[in-house]
């Protein structure tokens, strides 16, 4: 497929995205995304964009339950790629909502390897917290053991939003029956100058306290995190309705 035809497909998707624009929402949301230039924000409410992602996914082979031998543009001639594949391979995207659409499409993929392949290609291009925090593909819940290797690779990345996504994945998938204190300790050991990494560390520890209080509490008692993340985790835990008043009172004594 030539570059002109690929561009036509991307422009068609952009036209449809702008048709979903809510200008008032754009003004509001731009204030929440200080590191994204306003001209890169279209202004589409999340439920509307998710619905569009579902419509776009219909008919694409990427959303089959089982990957075929030649599924994905990485393994077939470009002429054989469908429009969703062409969009997913048109990185980097310009608009913020294109990045969100990209993530929403990956989250719908039903084949583990396909979802993982596309996610790992996309992660280095994520440039904001909202895209990063969109969630994880549902199929990952069925493959937690093999996913862990990749999660730890993300934690070791030099890309802040890849690290944030790794921590978020541990928070979403590994705080209940699959919890291991090792995961919490490894998150606590992460050292970063990046605000959005440290905020996710705090969010993870606060959520871990809500679900695994006795196991996670020593991380704060022994001051295993940097001071900023330590105090922010306590703040977020004390804001949680899942933490008891008695626990909140004790946590306040652990501030540094």
Regions found by a protein language model. Name each.
Residues 1-256:
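Alpha-helical scaffold domains
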């Amino acid at each position: 497929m030539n570059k002109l035809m690929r561009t036509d497909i991307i422009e068609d998707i952009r036209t449809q995205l702008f048709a979903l624009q809510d200008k008032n929402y754009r003004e509001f949301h731009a204030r929440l995304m200080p590191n994204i230039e306003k001209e890169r924000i279209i202004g589409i409410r999340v439920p509307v964009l998710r619905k569009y992602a579902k419509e776009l996914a219909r008919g694409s082979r990427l959303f089959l339950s089982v990957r075929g031998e030649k599924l994905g543009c990485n393994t077939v001639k470009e002429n054989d790629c469908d429009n969703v594949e062409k969009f997913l391979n048109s990185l980097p995207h310009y608009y913020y909502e294109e990045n969100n659409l990209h993530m929403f499409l990956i989250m719908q993929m039903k084949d583990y390897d396909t979802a993982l392949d596309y996610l790992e290609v996309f992660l280095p291009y994520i440039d904001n917290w909202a895209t990063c925090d969109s969630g994880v593909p549902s199929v990952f819940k069925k493959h937690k053991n093999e996913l862990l290797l990749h999660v730890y690779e993300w934690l070791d990345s030099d890309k802040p939003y890849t690290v944030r996504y790794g921590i978020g994945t541990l928070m979403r998938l590994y705080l209940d029956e699959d919890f291991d204190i090792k995961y919490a300790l490894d998150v606590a050991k992460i050292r970063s100058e990046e605000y959005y990494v440290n905020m996710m560390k705090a969010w993870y520890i606060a959520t871990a306290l809500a679900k695994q209080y006795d196991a996670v509490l020593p991380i704060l008692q022994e001051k295993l995190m940097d001071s900023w993340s330590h105090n922010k985790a306590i703040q977020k835990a004390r804001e949680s309705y899942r933490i008891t008043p008695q626990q909140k009172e004790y946590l306040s004594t652990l501030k540094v």
